[in-house]
């Protein structure tokens, strides 16, 4: 049933019918390989983002004891995921899960972009006020003098939850006054966690876009206020892109080459598009045509799919095709794609597959039972990626058209959050997933 008025869009009628029915699908991007837009980040931009996180590692280790075992690096394990394979996908290459759900402090992929943007801001303010020079030890940013300086500044962000956690944890630790505008989709425990860190949480009855807009408007009227714009921030995007170097080192250590004979498939949950767009950009810069990035969106919130499939020239919302943007995947409940990441994904994403809430909870159960990983629903969205390629006509056509031998491929499924979720929430997720499986068995 359609929940919003439908706006005429240049969408294929068959695709539109599938979207409006809420049916999971795989859409292949015909624009992959087109030239990047002029505003695309440069190689120097990527290098500087990596250098910033490296020089600030000591600072992060000082601020957060959880990061000391990693020397302050924002890094997550790459876990073999062969137990996820079903009998019908047994020959589909080597599978891994990228465990950003286990990232310390923020507990999600958003630590990569969020920490990078806050660190860039802190460096800029401190350099302007003479607290640090270009080559100085960044641990000086944790000094009392720096804390007093940052306390005169505000950091503000709009979020469905995880980006707010990332920004809020680091900005407040450095001393910034921090304000997070949270949409109705945000979980109560995320709001509570921020408040215990002294973060001002502003709750909104509307969706993600309304929370972001409210934050943007408030920030515009405040002196010394930096707004982290999830819909268009280059600093967030570049922070996500740094994950490519980390993954490349892990794949090399695992003995998985990436080249014409050994393609890499990366499956990423997608909300507004910044995190998957940044990671795709970093991977494409490193591997070119040998990496194939597929993004996963809820059937109720396929904002990137709708944007790309409609041609990409003008902003398009899932509301324009009659969808309601309501899903248990709170981190992916976004109605309109990023105006920064969208055009970059248009040129670089291999495709988009959608997942309904029942599939999300089935994937959650698989992650728990087969890999011993507890995830939040959003983080499980990409687990169906390899199956779409092996088990659908569109997926098999994609492989055939590129001469890809499935057995030679490496699949990386990005798990984006879950380690900070309270135990009671995890029990609720698992109970729902188990009940759903029992119902499916009874109806079989």
Swiss-Prot record:
Keyword Lyase (UniProt): yes
GO MF, any single term: D-serine ammonia-lyase activity
GO biological process terms, semicolon-separated: D-serine catabolic process; isoleucine biosynthetic process
Family matches, as InterPro entries: D_Ser_am_lyase, Ser/Thr_Dehydratase, TrpB-like_PALP, TrpB-like_PALP_sf
Catalytic function, reaction form: D-serine = pyruvate + NH4(+)
Keyword terms, alphabetized: Lyase, Pyridoxal phosphate
SUPFAM superfamilies in alphabetical order: Tryptophan synthase beta subunit-like PLP-dependent enzymes
HAMAP family: D_Ser_dehydrat (MF_01030)
Family of this protein: Belongs to the serine/threonine dehydratase family. DsdA subfamily.
Protein known as: Probable D-serine dehydratase
Source species of the chain: Burkholderia thailandensis (strain ATCC 700388 / DSM 13276 / CCUG 48851 / CIP 106301 / E264)
């Amino acid at each position: 049933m359609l929940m919003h008025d439908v706006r005429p869009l240049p969408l294929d009628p068959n695709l539109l019918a599938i979207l409006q029915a809420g049916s999971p699908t795989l859409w292949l991007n015909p624009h992959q390989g087109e030239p990047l837009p002029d505003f695309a980040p440069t190689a120097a931009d990527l290098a500087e983002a990596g250098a910033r996180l490296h020089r600030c590692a000591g600072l992060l280790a000082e601020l957060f004891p959880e990061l000391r075992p990693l020397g302050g690096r924002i890094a997550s394990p790459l876990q073999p995921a062969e137990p996820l394979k079903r009998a019908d996908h047994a020959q589909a290459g080597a599978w891994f899960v990228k465990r950003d759900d286990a990232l310390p402090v923020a507990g999600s992929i958003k630590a990569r972009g969020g920490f990078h943007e806050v660190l860039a801001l802190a460096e800029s303010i401190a350099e302007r006020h003479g607290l640090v020079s270009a080559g100085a030890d960044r641990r000086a940013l944790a000094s009392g003098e720096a804390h007093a300086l940052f306390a005169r500044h505000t950091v503000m962000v709009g979020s469905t939850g995880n980006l707010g956690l990332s920004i809020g944890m680091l900005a407040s630790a450095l001393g910034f006054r921090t304000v997070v505008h949270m949409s109705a989709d945000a979980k109560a425990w995320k709001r509570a966690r921020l408040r215990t860190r002294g973060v001002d949480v502003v709750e909104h009855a509307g969706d993600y876009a309304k929370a972001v807009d409210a934050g943007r408007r408030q920030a515009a009227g405040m002196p010394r206020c930096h707004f982290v714009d999830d819909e268009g921030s280059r600093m967030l995007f570049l922070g996500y892109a740094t994950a490519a170097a980390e993954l490349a080192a892990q794949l090399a250590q695992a003995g998985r080459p990436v080249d014409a004979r050994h393609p890499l498939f990366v499956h990423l949950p997608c909300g507004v598009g910044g995190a998957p767009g940044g990671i795709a950009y970093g991977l494409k810069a490193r591997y070119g045509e040998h990496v194939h990035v597929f993004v996963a969106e809820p059937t109720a919130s396929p904002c990137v799919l709708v944007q790309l499939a409609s041609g990409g020239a003008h902003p398009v919302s899932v509301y324009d095709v009659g969808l309601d943007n309501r899903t248990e995947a709170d981190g992916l409940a976004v109605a309109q794609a990023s105006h920064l990441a969208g055009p970059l994904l248009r040129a670089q994403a291999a495709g988009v597959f959608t997942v309904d809430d029942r599939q999300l909870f089935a994937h959650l159960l698989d992650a728990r039972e087969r890999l011993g990983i507890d995830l939040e629903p959003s983080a499980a969205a990409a687990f169906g990626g390899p199956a779409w390629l092996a088990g659908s006509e569109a997926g098999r056509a994609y492989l055939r058209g590129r001469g890809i031998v499935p057995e030679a491929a490496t699949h990386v499924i990005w798990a984006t959050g879950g380690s900070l979720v309270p135990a009671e929430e995890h029990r609720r997720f698992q109970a729902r997933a188990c009940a759903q499986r029992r119902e499916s068995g009874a109806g079989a």
